[in-house]
Amino acid sequence: MGQWDEKEPREVEVVKGACLILRREALKQVGLLDESYFIYSEEVDLCYRLHQAGWRVYWVPQAVVMHYGGQSTRQTAGEMFIRLYQGKLFYFRKHYGRGTFRAYKLLLLFASLARLCMSPLAWLERPPERQRHLTLASYYSRLIRSLPKL
């Protein structure tokens, strides 16, 4: 895969974010955003369904939208972290079946445990970085505890 011009529109698998412009015909064919997602990954799901129906998805760098981050969630960073992975797990269960869902969940567990095992190394960092690593460790700990419920 070669370089691409970031100033030119480009066909992509997924566009993520707060603004999507879609053809009415496409929405009629594939449906709206799936409300089963609490938040996060619903746009990935929509793009997947668009591709499955034969539509193409483009990223257009000239399109600019002002997004005031977090205005729709009002969650703590830890809650948002858990919700992000909830959305990903729901996506895998919905589109790839139980086996892939379980494999992703197991991979997520091992990756989270690895991150948690590395968290003591945070004490070797300067205080601001140390705090960031310790905060992330607390998020991964919460994620591990929530995995059986997901």
Residue locations for each model-derived region?
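A C-terminal cap/extension of S-adenosyl-L-methionine-dependent methyltransferases
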Residues: M1-G2, E6, R10, L27, ...
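A short, conserved alpha-helix in the catalytic core of glycosyltransferases
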Residues: W4-E8, E13-V64
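A structural signal for well-ordered alpha-helical scaffolds and beta->alpha junctions
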Residues: D5-E8, V15, F81, Y85, ...
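Residue-level signal for well-ordered alpha-helical scaffold segments within enzymatic catalytic domains
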Residues: E25, Q29, R49, G87-F90, ...
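Active-site-adjacent helix/loop segment of glycosyltransferases
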Residues: Y48-Q131
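Membrane-interface aromatic/basic loop that binds lipid-linked glycans or pyrophosphate carriers
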Residues: R130-L150
